[in-house]
Amino acid sequence: MEERERGKEKGSKGKGRKKRGKKGAGEAKEESKEEDRGEEEEESVEADVPVEEMAAGGARPKKKSPKEKSKGEEHCYKVHKRVLRWMKSAERIKYELDNGEEEKWRGRSIEEIEEQKVLHDITEVLKLLRSKECDKFFARTGKYMKGGSERWNMVGVGILEEGGKKRVGNVEVGLFEGKGGENIIYHLMFKPTDFEEEGEGARPSFGRCDGVDAIEEGRISDMSGFQYPPGVRSEITSSGSEFRIVWKNQRDTSLVLRSLTVLRIPEIR
């Protein structure tokens, strides 16, 4: 009897594995169909990015339903995979771009990818976008149709510091409405408009930030020798006038790689 039970158990496990295999093949086939229709970008998987896990001092959030907000969150957004890919290595990004649907990104050199990664790999901004303070830092545009989807943009003023240089520009956010009614971020980057000279402030230009045809922390003290916990790559600070992200070397946090400061929009009186 015991041997029979074991046989049944093995059989049931085998069936379970077969079912999972079929599901994976079906998903791959479905993605292939969407690429053929030119709609791969809209149909691809979106994700709720746990920003708290990437920034120092953040608590790991509990799993929540797509429409459920975390404590302190005002806006609920999902993130498209074309935004998340910029968190990967330059080599991996190049591979995905060369084999992707967006022709303008194909054939880029590793050097170009690394330059673009500095401008696009700013997913920590999501913490501000989801917060109640979002509208104090970002201006919204009206909705419009493009590539078969309803879209809109959000634009903020930012200063990117890297290698001793400051660049002034816009923090661009592109969104579209998913089939389930959720708001999905498909474009996120810092777009330089000028180099900041000493004694001068930001002079960004606000405009539509959409080049995609079809959607397929305060001053940081020296902590030499300190290492971030696994998965943490930045520190975030926020005040009434600015939201600051500092990216440091994960093995030695005394080495600052770059920083991005999003400035509050001046109130019009």
From Swiss-Prot:
InterPro entries in the cross-refs: UPF0329
Domain of life of the organism encoding this protein: Eukaryota
Biased segments, Basic and acidic residues type: 1-12, 24-36
Signal peptide range in chain numbering: none
Disordered: annotated segments: 1-74
Family, per entry: Belongs to the UPF0329 family.
Stretches with biased composition (Basic residues): 13-23
Pfam families hit by this protein: DUF1609 (PF07753)
Record-given protein name: UPF0329 protein ECU04_1660
Ranges annotated as biased composition (Acidic residues): 37-51
